[in-house]
Amino acid sequence: MRVKVILACTECKQRNYNTMKNKKNNPNRLEIKKYCPFCNKHTVHKQTK
């Protein structure tokens, strides 16, 4: 089952990205290193509630 998730920057807490996640393959919270336009650098983005 694929669900829509929101990714937030760990440094500035801005919610920058929306993505899809397969709950069966990834039951834990998603963590991806992506570009944050507010920090102007690549940071770790975590899945929000």
From Swiss-Prot:
Gene3D superfamilies given in the database record: Ribosomal protein L33
Keywords in alphabetical order: Ribonucleoprotein, Ribosomal protein
Source species, domain of life: Bacteria
InterPro entries: Ribosomal_bL33 (IPR001705), Ribosomal_bL33_CS (IPR018264), Ribosomal_bL33_sf (IPR038584), Ribosomal_zn-bd (IPR011332)
GO cellular component: cytoplasm; ribonucleoprotein complex; ribosome
Similarity annotation: Belongs to the bacterial ribosomal protein bL33 family.
GO term, biological process aspect, one: translation
GO molecular function: structural constituent of ribosome
Protein name as it appears in the record: Large ribosomal subunit protein bL33
HAMAP family: Ribosomal_bL33
